[in-house]
């Protein structure tokens, strides 16, 4: 990240096993924000919108054989028009660069809030487009189910110990905090440790708090669709945690 005269330049990059053309990047990257925000933010009329509110409005995109770039023209999160947002597929990497953007928020608040969300969501989108195979061997469905059962038992036990009333609410709160803390620190819960498995980004790296939050929020969708939509949305996978 670099600041210059009130404008900021931010870059995120992930390895990629495929090469993507500029037109494909144009039609997939920004629209996929709807998926990774679970419908909260949508791309419409070249604007990223939260409900009816345009957060960032872009001008017409410019494309090359390996990249697409949108000029920034306005929106609630933009202090003044200027700068560009570019996605490039080259050299075995997918790279997103926000260059010359002037945020509406003061620098300290921007760095503590919007910048963190930007890094987290952009990285998820890049990983989802990167076409990477799982970095390690994956545990069997039976092993995953056993780990889930252990974690549910742990959370239920804590709820029984610490709550005499509203145990369902307490169980829910404990389960949320337990999984978010476990996934975004070590990648593994108590059930995962017992069954020797952990959650990782699809490139093998530790998952972020944003990925953990997306994964947990999308779990009901996985149950409805009967496939791991939570891993697809958060760009995560469960891998065997082999002792060194």
Regions from the PLM with identified roles:
Residues 96, 118, 151:
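Hydrophobic pocket/interface hotspot
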Residues 49-91:
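Hydrophobic-ligand binding "helix-grip"
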Residues 79-112:
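Beta-strand/loop substructures that line and gate deep hydrophobic ligand-binding cavities in soluble
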Residues 13, 73-75, 90-92, 101-103, ...:
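Generic structural motif
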Residues 108-135:
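A conserved amphipathic terminal alpha-helix motif
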Residues 128-244:
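Membrane-interfacial and juxtamembrane segments of integral membrane proteins
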Residues 1-65, 138-141, 145:
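Hydrophobic ligand-binding cavity/cleft-lining segments
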Residues 8, 68, 94, 197, ...:
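A broad, low-specificity signal marking well-ordered, structured residues that form hydrophobic/aromatic
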């Amino acid at each position: 990240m670099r600041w210059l005269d009130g404008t900021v330049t931010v870059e995120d990059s992930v390895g990629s096993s495929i090469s993507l053309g500029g037109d494909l990047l144009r039609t997939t990257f920004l629209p996929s924000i709807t998926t990774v925000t679970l419908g909260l933010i949508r791309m419409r009329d070249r604007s990223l919108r939260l409900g009816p509110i345009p957060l960032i409005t872009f001008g017409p995109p410019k494309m090359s054989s390996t990249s697409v770039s949108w000029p920034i023209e306005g929106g609630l999160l933009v202090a003044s028009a200027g700068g560009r947002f570019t996605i490039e597929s080259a050299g075995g990497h997918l790279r997103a660069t926000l260059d010359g953007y002037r945020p509406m928020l003061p620098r300290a608040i921007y760095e503590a809030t919007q910048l963190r969300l930007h890094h987290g969501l952009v990285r998820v989108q890049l990983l989802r487009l990167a076409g990477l195979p799982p970095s390690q061997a994956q545990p069997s469905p039976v092993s995953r189910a056993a780990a889930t059962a252990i974690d549910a038992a742990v959370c239920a036990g804590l709820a029984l110990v610490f709550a005499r009333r509203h145990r369902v609410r307490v169980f829910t709160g404990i389960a949320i905090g337990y999984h978010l803390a476990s996934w975004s620190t070590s990648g593994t819960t108590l059930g995962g440790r017992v069954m020797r498995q952990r959650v990782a980004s699809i490139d093998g790296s530790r998952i972020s708090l944003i990925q953990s939050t997306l994964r947990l929020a999308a779990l009901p969708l996985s149950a409805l669709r009967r496939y791991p939509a939570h891993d697809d949305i958060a760009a995560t996978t469960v891998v065997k945690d082999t002792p060194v």
